[in-house]
Swiss-Prot record:
Domain comment quoted from the record: The Q motif is unique to and characteristic of the DEAD box family of RNA helicases and controls ATP binding and hydrolysis.
Organism whose genome encodes this protein: Dictyostelium discoideum (Social amoeba)
Role description: Probable ATP-dependent RNA helicase.
Pfam family, any one: DEAD
Protein name per Swiss-Prot or TrEMBL: Probable ATP-dependent RNA helicase ddx5
Motif window: DEAD box: 373-376
Annotated keywords: ATP-binding, Cytoplasm, Helicase, Hydrolase, Nonsense-mediated mRNA decay, Nucleotide-binding, Nucleus, Ribosome biogenesis, RNA-binding, rRNA processing
GO biological process: nuclear-transcribed mRNA catabolic process, nonsense-mediated decay; rRNA processing
Disulfide-linked positions: none
The keyword Nucleus belongs to this UniProt entry's keyword annotation: yes
Entry-linked CDD domains: DEADc (cd00268), SF2_C_DEAD (cd18787)
Domain (Helicase C-terminal) ranges: 450-603
A Gene Ontology term for the protein's cellular component: cytoplasm
């Protein structure tokens, strides 16, 4: 057990006074080369380390390492900012005073529909049926009249009578048409009530050719041969095109990325200067750069690269330029890229963006649309200071879009700083946790030191040997490396990805995994959010995540396309996860998952939970038979014990009676022998021997 114990405890050598002097750390070369000491954890804000000393230790080591890098670089160029660590930099940006600036107006509304009611907020839940409104035009009937015969008056009278009859028929037809129109109006009202949910007058884009969408979006969907939009996209596109701020939540793989990328097309085209022809000279005017119009903030580098790859088709079709910047690679290359491309859409992680703003390479004063992808992660405590600095660089009337798979109620107050009324809250599915019914989920309660063997046994099952893509998630890099060595010794080929490795290698590993050149990947939460790989069949939580929201993000990586049949998720839980057992089991029940009875029994025994479960008929019969046998055995044992007790009592009573009678006789014989001093010695020895037999009584 000692070898599995975490070596980072309160007695760690970094807490010794000889290693800490004047808030500085003195480390040997071997300690600096040891990655396991320098990099403790890669999960969300080091939540896995509960003791404050460990946070201080990590901070001291990082500062020392940072000083060494600055000395090597020479101090002219600042060190790179890792966007995943909020404590990696100390930059304070001055917010722009937009009140003193005459801000140019911009078009927000691109929805081809009636205006929205003036109320504080809207909330869309669930789905509606597809309805198409058809406007029928009234056709006028024309009749040809014969030429009048002046000499034949009778014919004229007959014609007049025929005309009167025709007029009567026309009147009857008109009445029938009016009745049909009234019926159609009633039908249209019913359709409008269903097409515009909750009386909000925001339609649903059932197809890419819906009337509510602008022509630029229709052209985009036509050229890309876009299939039927997902349920989330049907609601999200019209909602964003209204120009209002929006919070959107839906399960992983529901098309949230394209849900906010598509409305950017009309938003940018309305402000991009295309350099049209001069009316007088007929010459083409040079294009003028309008600045960054849309900013997309993402929590991880991998998600930023994925979003950027989805914007390339927009650049090809409409000439809207996009760029992505993130930490982990050279800033000079990104600066050259920004100066060359001059993007209208910028995708970035918070840390690198703040550094670029401070150095004067990025100006956000022209941004009119702000997107927070994975908003629940972005609005967590560690990143809020960075986001507030970025928000101070953007005009206050910008349209803000917050999308995520989960958005707990605890973040509603925080989101008020980013959402202006009237706002729209779009929710498809559960209020906090998405539905993952399409994924078969199972769990096992196990001791921590038994998890490695259990993982190897699990990976040796047929479903994992078929070379189906599998991701194994860890909370700590140290544990990931240890398990990786064990798997290599067991001849199980795999790749590993975590925060320590270079960005180029991380990109290569993701491309290798997505192209099926490798099928087993060990990872931290670095790819637990937003990364879209179509054909992932299995998810294994070697370390159970520290929240159910993160569990949904991890498990949601599987089964994101029709190619994947029967995706599965398996989780190991230990005693340290006891605080999540009850909500996790309730979540599985809400998902209609078959929870194993041994798992529930162990939870009841170890954690004192009171989970109820029903056994199958076969198991019930077996248990009933066992109970009957046990009852019979207990009855036989009880009877046997009673008989033994009775026999013991009888034996003891008989012996006591014999002893008492013998004792009386012996006393009488002794009294008679007192007068007779010359008694036989043989008789005395016999009486002594008899007395010895009854001494035990």
């Amino acid at each position: 057990m000692n070898k599995y114990k975490n070596k980072y405890n309160t007695d760690n050598k970094f807490n010794n006074s000889k290693y800490i002097k004047n808030n500085q750390v003195e480390l040997s070369k071997q300690e600096l080369e040891d990655e396991e000491i320098l990099k403790i954890n890669d999960d969300e804000f080091n939540e896995g380390l509960n003791k404050q000393a460990l946070f201080q230790q990590d901070d001291y080591v990082y500062k020392f390492k940072k000083q060494q890098k600055e000395e090597k670089i020479g101090g002219d160029e600042k060190t790179q900012i890792d966007n995943e660590k909020p404590e990696d930099f100390n930059i304070t940006l001055k917010s722009i005073d937009f009140k003193s600036i005459n801000l140019p107006s911009f078009k927000k509304r691109f929805l081809q529909s009636s205006t929205i009611k003036d109320i504080d907020s809207f909330e869309f839940i669930n789905s509606t049926t597809e309805f198409i409104i058809e406007n029928k035009s009234d056709d006028d009937n024309y009749y040809d009249d014969d030429d009048d015969d002046e000499g034949d008056k009778n014919k004229e009278k007959e014609k007049e009578k025929e005309k009167e009859k025709e007029k009567e028929k026309e009147k009857e037809k008109e009445k029938e048409k009016e009745k049909e129109k009234e019926k159609e109006k009633e039908k249209n009202k019913e359709i409008e009530n269903k097409t515009y949910p909750n009386n909000c007058k925001i339609p649903i884009a059932n197809t890419g050719e819906s009337e509510c969408l602008p022509n630029t979006l229709k052209l985009f969907f036509k050229k890309t041969q876009f299939p039927t939009p997902t349920l989330f996209q049907q609601y999200a596109w019209p909602a964003i095109l209204t120009g209002h701020d929006i919070i959107g939540t839906s399960l992983p793989g529901s098309g949230k990325t394209l849900g906010y990328l598509a409305p950017m097309i009309p938003h940018c085209l309305a402000r991009v200067d295309r350099g049209g022809k001069n009316k007088i000279t007929g010459e083409k005017a040079p294009k003028q750069y309008t600045g960054i119009l849309v900013l997309v903030l993402v929590p991880t580098r991998e998600l930023g690269l994925q979003v950027h790859s989805n914007t390339l088709i927009i650049t090809q079709l409409f000439g809207i330029k996009t760029s992505v910047i993130y930490g982990g690679i050279s800033k000079n290359l990104q600066i050259e890229q920004l100066e060359k491309e001059k993007p209208q859409i910028l995708i970035s992680t918070p840390g690198r963006l703040i550094e670029m703003i401070e150095n004067g390479h990025v100006d956000l004063s022209s941004v009119t649309m702000l997107v927070l992808d994975e908003a629940d992660k972005m609005l967590s405590k560690g990143l809020i200071p960075q986001l507030k600095q970025i928000r101070g660089q953007i005009r206050p009337d910008s349209q803000n879009i917050l999308f995520s798979a989960t958005f707990p109620d605890s973040l509603k107050e925080v989101s008020k700083d980013w959402i202006k009324d009237p706002s729209i809250r779009l929710r498809i599915g559960s209020s906090e946790l998405p539905k993952l019914n399409h994924i078969q989920q199972d769990a096992q309660l196990i001791a921590h030191h038994k998890k490695p063997r259990a993982l190897i046994k699990l990976l040796s099952e047929p479903q994992f040997k078929e070379k189906k893509k599998t991701i194994v998630f860890f909370n700590k890099i140290k544990e990931l490396k240890r398990i990786s060595i064990m798997l290599l010794k067991s001849n199980i080929k795999h790749d590993t990805i975590f925060g320590n490795i270079d960005q180029e290698l991380r990109e290569k590993l993701i491309n290798k995994f997505s192209s099926s050149r490798s099928t087993l990947l060990l990872s931290t939460d670095i790819i637990g959010r937003g990364i879209h790989i179509d054909d992932i069949f299995n998810i294994i939580n070697y370390d159970f995540p520290r929240s159910l929201e993160q569990y949904c993000h991890r498990v949601g990586r599987a089964g994101r396309s029709d190619k994947v049949v029967n995706p599965k998720a398996f989780s190991f839980l230990t005693n340290s996860d006891s605080y999540l057992v009850e909500p996790f089991v309730q979540f599985l029940k809400d998902q209609h998952q078959n929870i194993s009875i041994p798992f529930l029994k162990l939870c009841n025994e170890n954690f004192g939970t009171k989970f109820e479960f029903t056994l199958s008929k076969r198991k019930q019969k077996k248990l009933a038979q066992k109970d009957d046998v046990e009852k019979d055995d207990e009855a036989y044992l009880a009877k046997y014990e009673k008989l033994i007790k009775k026999d013991r009592k009888k034996d003891s009573d008989d012996e006591c009676k014999k002893f008492k009678s013998f004792k009386r006789k012996n006393i009488d014989s002794d009294s008679d022998n007192d007068s007779d001093s010359n008694s036989d010695n043989g008789k005395e020895t016999k009486s002594k021997d008899k007395n010895k037999k009854f001494k035990k009584y």
